[in-house]
Structure formats: C-alpha cells, structure tokens
C-alpha cells in the first residue's frame, strides 16, 4: 500500500508524490524452544494458566491474584523468571524445572528481586523434574550444594568436665541450603535437644539421668536439605 500526496504552488502547478508504506512487522512462526519468551503476559484472575516450555512448566490457578495482572515470564535453558515485584500472591503457583545436571546435591534455588538467593526445593519427581509450590515470584535456577553441615560445641571442649554447667550447647549450621534434620544420642540413648534456629543452636538441660553417669558419649548427626550429612562424637564428664 502507499500514500498519494498532491502538492500545488501559487501559480497552480501541481505535483503528485507516492509514498510507499513499509510493513515493519514481519510475520513470524512461533517456535517451541528453550528461549521462548512470554514477556508482560497478561494473567486474567478468573482463568487457570499452564505454561509449558522445553525444560520447565508453570501452573497459575485462578484467583491467585486480587485482579488481572501482568507477569514478565522468561524461560531459559538454565533458569526461569516470573517477575512482577508489585503484586502479592494469594495461592501457590506450581513450578516444575528439569534437572539436567544430575549431580549429587542439586537443588532448585530462588533469587528475589533484590538478588538474595535461597533454597527452594530438592524434591524430584520420576521424570527428574524439581517440583515446587510457592507464593514467591522471582528467578528459579539449579545449584549444587556439596558442603556438609557444621557441628561444633558451644560451651565445652571434647573431654571437658561439665559438672558445674546446667546446659550443653552446640552450633549447627548449613550456609547454603539449611538444616533439614538432626539427631542426638547420649550413651546410645536418643535425647531430645531443643533447636533455636535463629541462633543456629542446639541445647539440652541436664537432668537426673546424668547423676549416675560419670563419662558420657554424645553423638550428633545433622543433615542439610539436599542430603549432605555430618556426624560427630564428643565425650564429656559429670559427677
């Protein structure tokens, strides 16, 4: 198509000019590949949504938000972004991400809008996808944690006398994925320690059980969220 412009001067001379209209938008065939981008996807709040990519899936149930919203959804080979820092979620969205690395200690990590990273999930299904239900928008990607948790005594050294102390305390810490579980035995008997997670501290208040036990062996096992374990044995004395 084209525009036709007619120009005339004072003397009545006329000139016609044809200006072609160039179509700057080319038709493109959508491809189902790992770099498919759904930028600024409008999500209608009364509908369910399923996004299926080569290595990931996103399910957004209806009424996840208070109203219709726009999400910046980008899928890459090694990560997926679901972004809008201004909208809260009132239902969980479901994310499935293929674990191509297949390394011991792999997990799905999360990065928020401020760049802070944290553990998201280590749950794998039978197709080797990490599964996650979450109310957090941001970037999800695979990391590997190969570092065992830390166990160290807080208020004694191995072989110390603890007759004058009311508590026995340990620091347990996993800097990457966090603590999943811990177990403590004293003299081959399971003992219930209290866990103060904000202080990364395990502690136990001595009771009458220790009055008849001069030498005591304590065994601690700590496991992180991807299965890395640390086991330590200490000895302490009381009279």
Task: Describe these PLM feature segments.
Residues 1-25, 171-239:
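Long, low-complexity serine/threonine/glycine- and acidic-rich segments characteristic of extracellular
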Residues 13, 146-151:
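Proline-centered linker/hinge motifs at extracellular inter-domain junctions
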Residues 29, 43-46, 67-113:
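Proteolytic processing hotspots in large secreted/extracellular or virion-associated proteins
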Residues 45-68:
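Predominantly extracellular/luminal regions of secreted and cell-surface proteins
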Residues 61, 94-98, 167-175:
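Short edge beta-strand/loop segments characteristic of extracellular beta-sandwich folds
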Residues 86-88, 158-164:
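Short, solvent-exposed loop/linker segments at the N-terminal edge
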Residues 114-123, 188-194:
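Surface-exposed loop/edge segments in extracytoplasmic proteins
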Residues 129-148:
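C-terminal beta-strand-rich structural cap/linker in extracellular carbohydrate-active enzymes
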